From Swiss-Prot:
Gene3D superfamilies: EF-hand
Binding site for Ca(2+) 1: 118, 123
GO molecular function, one term: calcium ion binding
Phylogenetic placement of the source organism: Eukaryota, Discoba, Euglenozoa, Kinetoplastea, Metakinetoplastina
UniProt region (Disordered), positions on chain: 1-34
CDD domains: EFh (cd00051)
Domain of life: Eukaryota
Protein name: EF-hand protein 5 variant 1
Amino acid sequence: MQARGTVKVQGDAKVDGKMSTGQHSHHQHLNSTQANATTTALEYRAMNRPLYRGPISHNIISEMAEGFYVLSGGYKKLFIPSKDVYALMQNVGMHLTEEEFHDALRVIGQSEPQNADELSFSDFLLLMTREVDDTMADELRSAFFHYDKYKTGYVTRKQFTELFATLGERSTPEELEELLAVAEVDETDDKIDYNRFVNELTSRVNCM
């Protein structure tokens, strides 16, 4: 299983006693040591910045589907345990803490406690292959985490405006209204889903 800037199941990586043979066409010009070092660096960067810039090809989707199948124990299941995804990352050299892994789940919108134990294929694909505008999304989410002490995935309207009133160059009232429009909130909304906001903002930036 291989994706650009994401987790790859290599020849001897095992999940629940099963083995998956990865495709190595992107690294044929590298020797084994260089390939492993490059892959590990990309994997680490991918989880610290879980989104990458680039199209998702049919081959990548197929490889992700293969990995999802392996994690399902060889059965066609709709969901796989998120703990197995975490174990896979540990097996391929991504030594993430559980907190870092759960932060990655929050990035893809899995902020509700009842949704955190399982991932659908679309969630799995999203976790591994999303786009990003360099460091902006991570830095912005980190700023929201300061207000979201209990990791709910939401901030209040007041916290949202306070953040952008003090972040970098202060936003004007007009700019704040535009940001609230991106967040798709009106005057009656007090809670803002900041993951959804960052995703929408990043999508618009990437389309520029």
